[in-house]
Amino acid sequence: DASFHSWG
């Protein structure tokens, strides 16, 4: 889970 990245 890459909730640090920023997609969407």
UniProtKB/Swiss-Prot annotation:
Modified sites of kind Glycine amide: G8
Coarse class of the protein's main subcellular location: secreted
GO cellular component: extracellular region
Biological process annotations from GO: neuropeptide signaling pathway
Keyword Transmembrane helix: no
Location in or out of the cell: Secreted
Keywords: Amidation, Neuropeptide, Secreted
Function per UniProt: This cephalomyotropic peptide stimulates contractile activity of cockroach protodeum (hindgut).
Protein name in UniProt: Leucokinin-4
Annotated source species: Rhyparobia maderae
Organism classification: Eukaryota, Metazoa, Ecdysozoa, Arthropoda, Hexapoda
